[in-house]
């Protein structure tokens, strides 16, 4: 049986690599860790994973990215991966964004 997948999404390559490295060091025995560098790339990856009937357990996304915010990505990902948990990361102290994410897209 294939390992469930954790998808990380961040347009900053150094941040993306660091998050992926940290997740792999802790969870590689139980999860397959993959990454995308944009919301559009993440949605393409999620669609392909769904076509292959692979389980996405967690999506970890940066909030501020060009083209699509993390909130938009997590909202658009819901129909494709309804069972996945979702985490929104931001380096900014933006309380309004956090409240919107929790209320509008049901972040845990």
Task: Name what the model sees in each region.
Residues 3, 29-30, 54-58, 80-85:
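His-Asp phosphorelay/catalytic-motif detector in bacterial-type signaling
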Residues 12-18:
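Short acidic/polar segment at the start of the alpha1 helix of CheY-like receiver
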Residues 47-54, 76-83, 104-105:
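Conserved phosphotransfer cores of two-component systems
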Residues 65:
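Receiver (REC) domain active-site loop signature in two-component systems and cognate sites
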Residues 7-8, 60-62:
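Active-site T/S-Asp motif of two-component receiver
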Residues 20, 26, 35-58:
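Acidic, metal-coordinating helix/loop segments flanking the phosphotransfer/catalytic sites
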Residues 68-72, 79, 93-108:
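Alpha4 helix (beta4-alpha4-beta5 surface) of REC/receiver domains from two-component response regulators
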């Amino acid at each position: 049986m294939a390992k469930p997948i954790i998808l990380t999404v961040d347009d900053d390559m150094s941040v993306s690599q660091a998050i992926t490295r940290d997740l792999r060091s802790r969870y590689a025995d139980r999860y397959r860790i993959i990454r995308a560098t944009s919301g559009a790339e993440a949605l393409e990856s999620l669609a392909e994973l769904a076509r292959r009937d692979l389980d996405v357990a967690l999506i970890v996304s940066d909030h501020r990215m060009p083209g699509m915010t993390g909130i938009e990505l997590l909202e658009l990902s819901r129909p494709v991966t309804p069972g996945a948990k979702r985490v929104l990361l931001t380096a900014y102290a933006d309380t309004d964004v956090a409240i919107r994410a929790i209320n509008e897209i049901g972040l845990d």
